[in-house]
Amino acid sequence: MDNPTDSAGKCPVAHGNTPRSRSNRDWWPDQLNVQILHHNSGRADPLGQAFDYAEEFKKLHLHGLKKDLHALMTDSQDWWPADFGHYGGLFIRMAWHSAGTYRITDGRGGAGQGQQRFAPLNSWPDNANLDKARRLLWPIKQKYGNRISWADLLILTGNVALESMGFKTFGFAGGRADVWEPEELFWGPEGTWLGDERYSGERELAEPLGAVQMGFIYVNPEGPNGNSDPLASARDIRETFARMAMNDEETVALIAGGHTFGKKHGAGEPFLIGPEPEGGAIEDQGLGWKSSFGTGVGKDAITAGLEVTWSQTPTKWSNYFFENLFAFEWELTTSPAGAKQWQAKNAEASIPDAYDASKRHLPTMLTSDLALRFDPTYEKISRHFLENPGEFADAFARAWFKLTHRDMGPKVRYLGPEVPAEDLIWQDVIPAVDHPLVDDKDIAELKEKVLATGLTVQELVSTAWASASTFRGSDKRGGANGARVRLAPQKDWDANQPAQLAKVLGVLESIQKDFNAAQTGAKKISLADLIVLAGAAGVEKAAAAGGNAVSVPFTPGRIDASEAQTDAHSFAALEPRIDGFRNYLNGKRHQFMKPEEALVDRAQLLTLTGPEMTALVGGLRVLKAGAPEHGVFTSRPETLTNDFFVNLLDMGTQWVPVAGKEGFYEGRDRKTGAAKWTGTRVDLIFGSHSQLRAFAEVYGQADAKGKFVNDFVAAWNKVMNADRFDLV
């Protein structure tokens, strides 16, 4: 008979002490993370692979939804009361913070996937109490179901909040499909909230980051690290907003426009706030930041610790932000929570209380607000808006639209009746097709003409890759459509081998001109299409040389963008510092990733899987699409074979570092010591990393020659069509 234990009568479930299995990254933290290529693969999608959000959105009664949202704005709930009887300020902040994580360096972040619902964003200090905003929306999301995604609903609610307070918005586009798991993204090196290890030197912010501290969307409203210096704050603001693709005028308009509404909350000390949603108890059901100060809500709410209301009419559009900014001199004070903020000197108490109509407060501002007055450039813009409120309203409307739609990609992806007709340069405009497209007979004829020019496989493939591989699945920018590879800045990028690119484009433009001139009707071939078609011809020629007859798919319909439709400054962010597919590394620019990390990062932006990335690298190497002296592990260059994998995995080769050239290696015959190959970290990672080696072994097998060619062609076609949203 078993003896009773001391735990008899206790709950058998372990609380808080269940052992956690260690992941491979725990054991080897520097291990290359290939798993990011397989996140949001669809297996976690409860709606299934057949679900078409665009079709569901078309069934949405947008007017009815907006009517319900308007009603919600003033339907104050006891569990989270509305400031001033209106949730507008809360919902503007929710939408702003959903979109505001966008960063132009890699196009990641933003509102496009509804990531604010998931960790870590749902628990960032700067997103405190936005969990309540989303819970207020749940009955409406529940009512309209799959016809409106969370990602779209968060932004639409921000628009309706503005409209309900008398502001005329620029428009709204739907089309943001939800994802169902957190995005694994580099938000910074810090291990603590509000840490700022991302800086070096004279406050140089590490790339690709945009925010100043871990857990902030933008800047610290109290000033850099709490230093209440408006000019220092202006420096942070300018850098941070530039990294999310905003210029000075847009920055001023956004800050002032957003701070026309609502208030900040700092009724009590920060230690009275409970854990964030991800750290909360199970019975809290995903609600965080529970406050033990007074009632914890309404007048007793604590969010950022600041207690600021900017306007005399915080639920109506006005010019009070600028009027107050310039009307008073300001003195530093502290909120009830101890946060540093500014109070108007010699002013009347003109600011309403959020919960007591009989009370009035002195005007208050944040350090980051005063930056708009004391920075000379911002001050000039701010005074102009003060004196021209109509221009301010238009600037804010446009900047808000840009903020909330920046990561949606080209206009063809926009859905709904409120899409503005005006084309905006940041949308990377591509004209509509206005002519008949080439048919199969034309395609065959054009391929023959391309191959008859004497252009090599390497030249054709390199040019097509340079055109298409700028695509970013993050913000849907780049890609072959538009043929912007022929325009500044892309035509001059070092990675694109400008001299060779100019030569190839000149030949292709001549073919295009002759073909179009020979047509009796309006049929045309765009240069954008011809670049991709020429690349396909090169791949087919290389495959045939290796004994594999393949037809690379080609669908015409790309069109050429003009220089006037291209924001060269904005496109500069797409220039590759490293392109592992081409074995390219720009030694003149700061690198913030190892070459192999940059390869996986680029593959993820191209929406490639691990096997697709592997097949493309192996094929591009033997086709000499990149640095000609490295990674070309074949005696048959410009022939599409699996030689890269066969020779990389050959145990007769010993790899040794090249003296004085970090990241470069020489492959020597293991017996004789004779040099055979040279390669980079990107090449050797396919033999070193266990998962990538497993992929490489599949393609290095004796029976894989045909499979490799077919897989390469499929992956190649995926990249060439990555920006063809008209085909989806």
Curated annotation (Swiss-Prot):
Gene that specifies this protein: katG
Cofactor(s) needed by this chain: heme b
Protein name (record): Catalase-peroxidase
Tryptophyl-tyrosyl-methioninium (Tyr-Met) (with W-96) crosslink site(s): Y218-M244
Site note Transition state stabilizer, residues: R93
EC code: 1.11.1.21
Reactions catalysed, as given in the entry: H2O2 + AH2 = A + 2 H2O; 2 H2O2 = O2 + 2 H2O
Cofactor, how bound (note): Binds 1 heme b (iron(II)-protoporphyrin IX) group per dimer.
Positions contributing to heme b binding: H259
Family matches, as InterPro entries: Catalase_peroxidase (IPR000763), Haem_peroxidase (IPR002016), Haem_peroxidase_sf (IPR010255), Peroxidases_AS (IPR019794), Peroxidases_heam-ligand_BS (IPR019793)
UniProt subunit comment: Homodimer or homotetramer.
Role of this protein: Bifunctional enzyme with both catalase and broad-spectrum peroxidase activity.
CDD domains: catalase_peroxidase_1, catalase_peroxidase_2
SUPFAM superfamilies reported in the protein's UniProt record: Heme-dependent peroxidases
Processing after translation: Formation of the three residue Trp-Tyr-Met cross-link is important for the catalase, but not the peroxidase activity of the enzyme.
Region described as Disordered: spans on this chain: 1-26
Gene Ontology CC annotations of this record: cytosol
Covalent cross-link (Tryptophyl-tyrosyl-methioninium (Trp-Tyr) (with M-244)), residues: W96-Y218
A Pfam family matched in the record: peroxidase
Signal peptide: 1-16
